[in-house]
Amino acid sequence: MAKEKFNRTNPHVNIGTIGHVYHGKTTLSAAISAVLSLKGLAEMKDYDNIDNAPQEKERGITIATSHIEYETETRHYAHVDCPGHADYVKNMITGAAQMDGAILVVSAADGPMPQTREHILLSRQVGVPHIVVFLNKQDMVDDQELLELVEMEVRELLSAYEFPGDDTPIVAGSALRALEEAKAGNVGEWGEKVLKLMAEVDSYIPTPERDTEKTFLMPVEDVFSIAGRGTVVTGRIERGVVKVGDEVEIVGIRATQKTTVTGVEMFRKELEKGEAGDNVGVLLRGTKKEEVERGMVLCKPGSITPHKKFEEEIYVLSKEEGGRHTPFFTNYRPQFYVRTTDVTGSITLPEGVEMVMPGDNVKITVELISPVALELGTKFAIREGGRTVGAGVVSNIIE
């Protein structure tokens, strides 16, 4: 039984396959799991198993995604694959599956196609930090020069979107051939190429910083006043660690305030520290209940600042997904639900874009009526009368 070997000692990395439709993303996902299963490092997942992706809801948006897990000698991977192009766009914008790196699959027989470009652009905008390339369908290309030409095109395309095209690892192979070999029970010539790809992923995509190692941030969900003790704010710590005696800032909506943590509690028990993922109450020195409200954040001083105006990459829900039935134009004023609260803002469309239709993805400029704690990569929902009509991610801060 291969299952016994799964241990959690290896560092964990989230990756996914991206690329144009029919270039072989799902076949590659199946091939990776099949080849590694022969080494006792994964459970074999069939193509159909991955392709019939379950639907998930993230920020009110339904996305079909498949998650598979496997190990290499040095790491544990969670790998996400999406069946449809729209699912990729939604996945990347909502951050439903945060990727530490991606495997870009390009058919060697066809070269880069429109969605290849779009997925690279999206990776740049939503902050997928590293890309490794698999040139698939190598068995269909007889001409070595053609293969080199496709590789050159891919490198140029990556460089055009500010990825290091010249240094990006590119491995050629055939996912289908590797999968056929593995199903026959051996790792042959094509399986070796999949192992070579995974070796590149192991070495080129760095191990991500764990949430507890990042700077402290906790969105405020509720505020209480406790007689004789002061003000307690509650919420789930998004990242980092907070301890008694730490200086923190309260950021968003109003002027930034500084205070000191005098207590951290969880389920009414005193804690020495709270860390990423914990739901805690944080007692603040000298802070009045009316000075803090839902929608603000507690954070390490200087680590995040309040902003009103920024650019973001958004996906607008289609009518079938419960979104708007009609397009919207510049000056549309929905609510932007950031972390724990709705803030009204007005939208400016890019030059040359008259209107945005349900189902589109587009880059917009937003100006909020009050400032909130934002940084590159902050995700939020766009809502109208309490229902979600879109999702976005901050791609550039203006002021």
Curated annotation (Swiss-Prot):
Catalytic activity: GTP + H2O = GDP + phosphate + H(+)
MF terms in GO: GTP binding; GTPase activity; translation elongation factor activity
Every tr-type G domain range: 10-209
Location of region: G3: 81-84
Annotated segments matching region G5: 174-176
EC number: 3.6.5.3
Protein name per UniProt: Elongation factor Tu
Assembly with partners or alone: Monomer.
Organism encoding this protein: Helicobacter pylori (strain J99 / ATCC 700824)
Residues that, per the record, bind Mg(2+): 26
G2: annotated segments: 60-64
Region G1, residue ranges: 19-26
CDD domains xref list: EF_Tu, EFTU_II, EFTU_III
Name of the encoding gene: tuf
InterPro entries per record: EF-Tu_GTP-bd, EF-Tu_GTPase, EFTu-like_2, EFTU_2, G_TR_CS, P-loop_NTPase, Small_GTP-bd, T_Tr_GTP-bd_dom
Region (G4): 136-139
